Amino acid sequence: MLFRSTHDLGVVAEVADRVNVMYAGKIVESAPVADVYYRPLAPYTMGLLSSIPSVYGKGTGQLQAIPGQPPSLISLGSGCAFAPRCEFAKQVPDGKCASVQPELLEEAANHFARCHADRQSRATASTRFAPQGGAA
């Protein structure tokens, strides 16, 4: 078993069978590589993948960035560290994302994610990552 820590998602795709995506020191998604790349369930993973330049079609000339700033690791709150930057947090009632740390749960076979938002909403949003012509 080999562990590698990197921000180079191209390397991950080539050398790994499984990937753990981390944000603010916590695993937010853990799954086989193809599931993470084509069916991500954690909002941070979706943002990370959206920021990769595409070699297909015409680009806008600008990279897509995750809005906001990373949290201070010195003063993390009690909720999800990604909540202030998350497109799904506003859909979760009672400010749960900001106040309660989500658990890492198995949301599909051998695919774990840490998020309070409705799984179906996240799964629907993740379809934009499926390769053209169908899922891998």
PLM region spans:
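Short, small-residue-biased leader/transition segments that mark boundaries at the very start
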Residues: 1-2
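H-loop/switch region of ABC-family ATPase nucleotide-binding domains
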Residues: 6-7
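A short, surface-exposed alpha-helical micro-motif characterized by mixed small hydrophobic
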Residues: 12-14
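Short, glycine/charged-rich "phosphate-handling" switch motifs in NTP-dependent
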Residues: 18, 30
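Charged, flexible cofactor/metal-binding loops and thiol motifs
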Residues: 32-136
